[in-house]
Amino acid sequence: MLSRVVLSAAATAAPSLKNAAFLGPGVLQATRTFHTGQPHLVPVPPLPEYGGKVRYGLIPEEFFQFLYPKTGVTGPYVLGTGLILYALSKEIYVISAETFTALSVLGVMVYGIKKYGPFVADFADKLNEQKLAQLEEAKQASIQHIQNAIDTEKSQQALVQKRHYLFDVQRNNIAMALEVTYRERLYRVYKEVKNRLDYHISVQNMMRRKEQEHMINWVEKHVVQSISTQQEKETIAKCIADLKLLAKKAQAQPVM
């Protein structure tokens, strides 16, 4: 419990110690930089979250465990009592008024620790839990951010792996565009050739018609020119005779 209180007090006072100036001889200089060398790339064992067990708020449990095999269960207490009596008998430590003051202060401290220690420990634990929660939240946010970056990178890699499909689509689109252009030009050539052929056919038909008309006119002209006056009179007389004969036949037929 005392160790947690000391650690909380040290964590609270650390920012002020970092910003402190040179205070004087015998005082810790917080601005001094330690461990300036390159860090070692070896696995560092994690620090324990809680300190070791202690007895009477001061003596570590390991001390008793070390003496138990050699002195028994009561050995540490006998050793401590013997050391105190030895110091008093040899006047290494002399009892004075300050001794009673120290005992009174120690009793008050023990009473305060026993009564208010759990509340202070709970308060320190709550502060520690809040800090751990903030650190855990930051850790989870960082993990989520890194996971999102990994997912984005994977999606980008998947797109890169599938880019040949895009190239194939573009290649097919270009081939289709070239095919459409080729068909359009081929149709344009077909229409142009057809128009020219139609033009030549029209010209040939017109020339053939003109030749026929010219031939008919030429033949008719020469036939008319070849008829003499006597032949014309005979032809006219024969036509008149034929008409008279037809008229007589028409009159001779009874009317139905």
UniProtKB/Swiss-Prot annotation:
Asked if the Swiss-Prot or TrEMBL record annotates the protein with the keyword Transport, the reply is: yes
Mark the residues carrying the PTM N6-succinyllysine: 131
| Listed GO biological process terms | proton motive force-driven ATP synthesis; proton motive force-driven mitochondrial ATP synthesis; substantia nigra development
Q: Which UniProt keywords apply?
A: Acetylation, CF(0), Hydrogen ion transport, Ion transport, Membrane, Mitochondrion, Mitochondrion inner membrane, Transit peptide, Transport
Mark out the transit peptide.
1-42
| Main location as per UniProt | mitochondrion
Molecular function terms from GO: proton transmembrane transporter activity
**Which residues are recorded as modified (N6-acetyllysine)?**
139, 154, 162, 221, 233, 244
The UniProt family comment states: Belongs to the eukaryotic ATPase B chain family.
PANTHER family, alphabetized: ATP SYNTHASE F(0) COMPLEX SUBUNIT B1, MITOCHONDRIAL, MITOCHONDRIAL ATP SYNTHASE B CHAIN
Quote the function comment for this protein. Subunit b, of the mitochondrial membrane ATP synthase complex (F(1)F(0) ATP synthase or Complex V) that produces ATP from ADP in the presence of a proton gradient across the membrane which is generated by electron transport complexes of the respiratory chain. ATP synthase complex consist of a soluble F(1) head domain - the catalytic core - and a membrane F(1) domain - the membrane proton channel. These two domains are linked by a central stalk rotating inside the F(1) region and a stationary peripheral stalk.
Question: What's the protein here called?
Answer: ATP synthase peripheral stalk subunit b, mitochondrial
From which source organism is this entry?
Answer: Homo sapiens (Human)
